[in-house]
């Protein structure tokens, strides 16, 4: 089931990115981060109450790890990703994001001595190659300074995300995923709000929630990208090897290219078709492992 959860994560995140792009002309990256994370926290709480999931017996050590994971993986990494997206655009961001799967392989080996098979490495090579082929389109208007900071922020975002989710994998094995998600995103949300208050004052926080919750595209993106995909994402890491989950998650970049044709009126070029085919073959190879 872990592989299915990881694949569904890619599908949900792809929908979310399209919706976030449609909403991005209304709010800045920090505002989008706060709205989507608050939506996720509310969704997790409502689901826990409806399903009557009992509070797990987290140790103090577990709570500290979850809090640090939330601060790094949600509070910092998400902000770095959105800042990178703003500086270098979606095309280059997609290529920088290919560092995610190799980061998971390395960190999973360091944390858990998890060995990745040859099949997974081969599938990863094809999928990442497909992403580069289908998304590469260097924007001429980007300065060298923007390129450097955008790539740096993007790479750090992927590495921090990988480290933060793997740090809570042992906790997820014996505890409900929804509580893990709630604590991580609760800490990330509080961190982002505090940052906004220090940077721009209380008034912008209220404006952010007022405008954000009236933006139907942002709410849709939050539902798919923060509520559904986070639950599926954590479930994928709970029920399968970290390396397999990571490479299935990486397919979201290719799915975004397909969805952009229908929702954003992008053109499905030969280059994109080749990239999609390479990624599909790579996913099949990983699934046969």
Residue positions per predicted region:
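Membrane-interface interhelical linkers
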Residues: 1-31, 35-68, 78-88, 136-153, ...
């Amino acid at each position: 089931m872990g592989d299915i959860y990881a694949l569904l994560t890619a599908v949900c995140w792809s929908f979310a990115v399209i919706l976030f792009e449609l909403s991005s002309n209304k709010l800045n990256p920090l505002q989008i981060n706060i709205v989507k994370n608050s939506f996720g926290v509310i969704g997790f709480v409502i689901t826990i109450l409806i399903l009557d999931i009992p509070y797990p017996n987290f140790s103090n050590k577990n709570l500290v790890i979850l809090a640090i994971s939330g601060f790094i993986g949600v509070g910092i990494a998400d902000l770095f990703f959105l800042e990178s997206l703003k500086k270098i655009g979606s095309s280059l961001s997609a290529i920088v994001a290919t560092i995610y799967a190799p980061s998971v392989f390395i960190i999973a080996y360091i944390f858990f001595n998890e060995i990745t098979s040859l099949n997974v490495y081969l599938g990863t090579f094809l999928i990442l190659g497909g992403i580069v082929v289908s998304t590469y389109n260097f924007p001429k208007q980007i300065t060298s300074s923007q390129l450097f900071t955008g790539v740096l922020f993007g790479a750090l975002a992927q590495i921090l995300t990988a480290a933060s989710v793997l740090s809570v994998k042992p906790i997820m094995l014996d505890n409900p995923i929804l509580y893990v998600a709630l604590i991580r995103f609760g800490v990330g949300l509080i961190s982002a709000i505090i940052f906004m208050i220090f940077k721009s004052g209380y008034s912008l926080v209220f404006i952010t929630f007022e405008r954000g919750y009236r933006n139907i595209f942002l709410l849709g993106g939050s539902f798919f990208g923060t509520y559904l995909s986070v639950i599926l994402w954590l479930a994928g890491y709970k029920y399968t090897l970290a390396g397999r989950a990571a490479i299935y998650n990486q397919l979201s970049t290719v799915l975004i290219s397909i969805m952009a044709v229908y929702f954003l009126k992008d053109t499905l070029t030969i280059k994109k078709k080749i990239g999609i085919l390479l990624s599909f073959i790579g996913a099949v190879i990983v699934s046969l492992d």
